[in-house]
Amino acid sequence: MEGLWTSMVLVIVGWLLGVLSPAMIEIIRRQRDYPLLQQSLRADLAELRLLLALSAIGLKTAQGLLDRELLEWQRDVLSSHRGKSDMAKMLERTNTMLSYSDADLSALAAFEAQNKVATGHGLKKFSAPTISAMIPTLWQLPRGLQVELLEINQALSHLNEEVEYAQYYFRLTFENLASANHAIAKANLTSSYMNIAGMATRLVEKIDHVSHL
C-alpha cells in the first residue's frame, strides 16, 4: 500500500512540475529581461519627450508666443533630458536668451514669428517604437506601468490625428481657393497648430509623471 501511495505522489509531483515548469521559466525570463526592457522604455520615452517639447515650443514660437516662461520650460526640458541626443548647445542658447531683457525678448519673439519657416510640411506624426511593439504583451509588465503606457499610447494616437488635420489644412493653403476659403484654411491651420502644441505639452507632463520605471 505504501508503495502505491509513493507512486501516486510521484505521479502527481511529476504532473505538477510539467504544468508549472513553463510558468516558472516564463517568470524567470521576465525577471531577467525586465531591466533591459526598462532601459529601452526609458530611452524611448526620453526621446519622445524631447521631440514633443521642442515641437510644442516651435509651434508656439511661430505664433509669436515666445516668452520667458516658454524659454524656462525649454531650459528645464533640455537640462533634464536623459536620452541619446546631445542638447548642450541648445541649452546654452536658451540660457543666453533668458538673459535678455523683457524688451529684447519681445523683439526676438516678433522676429522669430515673422521669420519662422512654415512647419506644416515638416510636421510629422510622433512615435514611440518600444511602446508600440509592446502593446500586445503589456500584461507582462507591472500593473501601474501598464496603465501609464496605455495612457501615453492613447494620447499619442489622439495627437497624431491632430497632426493629420494640420497637414491637411497646410496643403489647403497652397491650393487655388477663394480668398475667404483660404483665410478659413489658414485659421484652421493655426488652430490645429495650437491644439498640437497643447496636446504635446500635456503629453510631456504625462511622461514626466511615469512612476513605475
Where are the regions a protein language model picked out?
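Membrane-embedded hydrophobic alpha-helical segments
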Residues: 1-31
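Interfacial alpha-helical end/capping and short helix-turn segments at domain and membrane boundaries
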Residues: 43, 47-213
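Juxtamembrane membrane-water interface segments immediately C-terminal to a transmembrane helix
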Residues: 28-49
